[in-house]
A protein has these predicted regions:
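Non-catalytic cap/lid and distal C-terminal segments of serine-dependent acyl enzymes
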Residues: 1-192
Length: 192
């Protein structure tokens, strides 16, 4: 959170009235025995920790609004893959989802076309329901990031199928400059 300047970005947006006041929770999602953000199966340890421990703890100890409409999940790199799977597969928990420079669509060690319907059931077969349950679906990537090509193609495929997705690219590689800009943009869109 320090390198990402999360507190500064959020404080400035809230003070300027550009973002709704919110609590930001950053978890260590790289749990032992899990394979991070590259498959639904590989992230079950983190999903369980997030849904069954972190969210209940926050709701018990802080003044928050409960329900999916009052929650967002976003992440960068591996966290973007986790946001893709956990955020999009659990619309009853999160209705705002952001992926910043995720390698989930390829671009590091290859990667081909993703079967969106297999990975996120209902994304293509029930697009209207998918769009209604995901108020904000946001994807971003650095313009010099090797992931930009696969990400752009994935967004084009989703849009062609009727998925409502916001896509932005920012100057930079797989590093903090585009991720800070992504958070700055995403935070202004959610909870409106």
């Amino acid at each position: 959170m320090q390198q990402g300047l999360t507190a500064n970005i959020m404080d400035n947006l809230i003070a300027a009235g550009k973002a709704i006041p919110m609590i930001v929770v950053s978890a260590n999602s790289n749990l032992p025995g899990a394979r991070g953000g590259y498959s639904w199966e590989g992230m079950q340890n983190f999903r369980d920790e997030l849904v069954n421990s972190i969210i209940p703890f926050v709701e018990k100890n802080f003044r928050t609004k409960s329900g999916a409409a009052s929650r967002a999940m976003c992440g960068l790199s591996m966290g973007g893959g986790q946001s893709f799977y956990i955020g999009l597969r659990t619309p009853e928990v999160f209705s705002n989802v952001g992926l910043f420079s995720s390698g989930i669509f390829g671009g590091i060690a290859g990667g081909g076309d993703m079967d969106f319907e297999k990975e996120i059931p209902g994304m293509l077969s029930a697009t209207g329901k998918f769009n209604a349950s995901h108020k904000i679906f946001y994807i971003s990537c650095g313009e010099q990031d090797p992931r930009i090509g696969p990400t752009t193609r994935a967004v084009e495929s989703m849009r062609k199928a009727g998925v409502e997705v916001i896509f932005e690219s920012f100057p930079g590689d797989h590093e903090w400059q585009p991720w800070r800009k992504s958070l700055h943009s995403f935070a202004q869109k959610i909870f409106r």
